[in-house]
UniProtKB/Swiss-Prot annotation:
InterPro entries in UniProt: Adenylosuccin_syn_GTP-bd, Adenylosuccin_syn_Lys_AS, Adenylosuccinate_synth_dom1, Adenylosuccinate_synth_dom2, Adenylosuccinate_synth_dom3, Adenylosuccinate_synthetase, P-loop_NTPase
Originating species: Acaryochloris marina (strain MBIC 11017)
Recorded metabolic or biological pathway in which this protein acts: Purine metabolism; AMP biosynthesis via de novo pathway; AMP from IMP: step 1/2
Binding-site list for substrate: 298-304
Name of the molecule in the record: Adenylosuccinate synthetase
Lineage of the species this protein comes from: Bacteria, Bacillati, Cyanobacteriota, Cyanophyceae, Acaryochloridales
Length: 446
């Protein structure tokens, strides 16, 4: 048995959906532990594309239980749309379970999110406008609506009448927006409640039972380390904790139940929305990476900002998450690049540093210190073993493993499941502590 957390090691959009889908073959349970419809993951199977925002990637495996944990925030309308889409595609959803403790995104959350972002003007955070932040804010203020509240028809009516009237004051007085009709909201969410009722469960207990039965559990994060509310590039972050520690809080399991942590990172770096980005490319190369990598958000369709791989961020992700290994995605996007740069340190106010600054103002003054490596100038998409790779592509991967100080277990070379190189078993392979001595890699190092 192995219980594994999969996290994003950059600013999200790293390809966690594909990696989770691959690992789900060995998992008995897949659990989503934070975030909401602000995150999207795409899985491609036999030329069929599945775009999901809330439902875990493991849903494509009929014998794998899928759980939406208590740390998520759920937009019922979007969740039902995903259920309907999967039903039409012939994918069973009978093995999906929704935590009764998860909070619910309401219409006023979306309205406040969009109006608040607009009011920020030049100080926009880059929110998706899907109501995620306000939903988490209500959770912290203890005024939120949970899934279990929707399951109690009479209690829901009473709670929603009070809450909607309270939010109407904010909508009208603060944002000059039209008020919501409490009865219309109640009627809408009663329909959602009836549809979701068969899926609702005490998911913390369900996960613990799976653990007691020695089943393999895979915890699936959304977004990425640098978007973490506590450890990311604040204030340009999400409202939850995508880091590995969030898996425990967002599902109701203890930290001793986690065996391994796998980080996912692109062979380059992308970011959506506002905030500092030291390796961002504003030239033709940045445009080329965006176009070759189809770097447009699953949720918003926004163009992603593109730049070179940042090893400072990589090392930070290793430290914050306790990564055991790394999955590197989209290596094939670099196939036609003449020279590839990797940021190995920052120059900050005249001083060089290899450590990530948590101060956003200081981070905005960071300039990348690059090491330049030769490109391989040939296709990698059909490679299935390390030996199949062009020597310079293998050298690039070895350098990343060495500079980030964690072994690479998976290399992704395309969107399809089989466009992948499995370097070592990411679930049952050696722990990072056994692979490193004095910071030097003994696997895939230069």
């Amino acid at each position: 048995m192995a219980n594994v957390v999969v996290i994003g090691a950059q600013w999200g959009d790293e390809g966690k959906g594909k990696i989770t889908d691959l690992l789900s073959r060995s998992a008995d349970v897949v659990v989503r532990y934070q975030g909401g419809v602000n995150a999207g993951h795409t899985v491609v199977v036999n030329d069929q594309t599945f775009k999901l925002h809330l439902i875990p990637s493991g849903i494509l495996y009929p014998n794998t239980d899928c759980i939406i944990g208590s740390g998520t925030v759920i937009d019922p309308k979007v969740l039902i749309e995903e259920l309907d889409m999967l039903d039409k595609l012939g994918v069973s959803t009978s093995h999906l379970f929704i935590s009764e403790s998860a909070h619910v995104t309401m219409p006023y959350h979306r309205m406040i999110d969009q109006a608040s972002e607009e009011r920020r003007g030049d100080h926009k955070i880059g929110t998706t406008g899907r109501g995620i932040g306000p939903t988490y804010a209500d959770k912290s203020e203890r005024t939120g609506i949970r899934i279990l509240d929707l399951m109690d028809p009479e209690g829901m009516k009473k709670q929603l009448r009070w809450t909607v009237n309270y939010k109407n004051v904010i909508l009208e007085k603060l944002y000059n927006l039209p008020h919501l009709d409490p009865e219309e909201v109640i009627a809408e969410y009663q329909v959602y409640a009836d549809r979701l009722r068969p899926f609702v469960a005490d998911c913390s207990l369900k996960i613990y039972d799976a653990y007691q039965q020695h089943r393999n559990i895979l915890f699936e994060g959304a977004q990425g380390t640098l978007l973490d509310l506590d450890h990311g590039t604040y204030p340009y972050v999400t409202s939850s904790n995508p880091v590995a520690g969030g898996a425990c809080v967002g599902t109701g399991v203890g930290p001793t139940m986690i065996d391994r942590v796998i980080g996912v990172a692109k062979a380059y770096t992308t970011r959506v929305g506002e905030g500092p980005f030291p390796t961002e490319l504003h030239d033709e190369m940045g445009v080329a990476l965006c176009e070759r990598g189809a770097e447009f958000g699953t949720t918003t369709g926004r163009r992603r900002r593109c730049g070179w791989f940042d090893a400072v961020i990589g090392r930070y992700a290793v430290r914050i998450n306790g990564l055991d290994c790394l999955a590197v995605t989209k290596l094939d996007i670099l196939d036609e690049v003449d020279e590839i740069k990797v940021c190995v340190a920052y120059e900050i106010d005249g001083h060089e540093s290899k450590d990530f600054p948590t101060n956003a103002r200081q981070f905005s003054r960071c300039n990348p210190v690059y090491k330049t490596l030769p490109g391989w100038k040939q296709s990698t998409i059909h490679c299935r073993t390390l030996e199949d790779l062009p020597p310079k592509a293998l050298d690039y991967l070895k350098f990343l493993a060495s500079i980030v100080e964690v072994p690479i277990a998976i290399v992704s070379l395309g969107a399809e499941r089989d466009e992948t190189i499995i370097v070592e078993d990411p679930i049952h392979g050696p722990k990072r502590a056994l692979l490193y001595s004095n910071g030097e890699s003994q696997a895939m190092s230069a």
